[in-house]
Curated annotation (Swiss-Prot):
The keyword Phosphoprotein does not apply. Belongs to an operon involved in the translocation of Yop proteins across the bacterial membranes or in the specific control of this function. This is Yop proteins translocation protein I. Induction: At 37 degrees Celsius in the absence of calcium. The gene is yscI. Keywords: Plasmid, Virulence. InterPro entries: T3SS_YscI/HrpB. It holds the Pfam family T3SS_basalb_I. Belongs to the YscI/HrpB family. One of its GO terms (biological process) is protein secretion by the type III secretion system. It comes from the Bacteria.
Amino acid sequence: MPNIEIAQADEVIITTLEELGPVEPTTEQIMRFDAAMSEDTQGLGHSLLKEVSDIQKTFKTAKSDLHTKLAVSVDNPNDLMLMQWSLIRITIQEELIAKTAGRMSQNVETLSKGG
């Protein structure tokens, strides 16, 4: 039977936090932390409201474009299809916004009841 030799490990195994000693953050970590702390501190609610506001602006723009197209008499089938597509897109966006708002209100109610 051959001899199997196990080499002794030369590295030190750290078993407690005290043995680790103080850890200094790198310059990159400090810069990332400072950047994160200096960002807008309005919170998640403010971010959500801003996103909904941005969606509302694009929604209003799409609606006004559609109204402009509908005001002009169009005989070209391609233009009619583009108008129909715009109307479908607006309808889908409207439904998604309504569903999102409903889900958000349900989540807020759940948080306020369970908190």
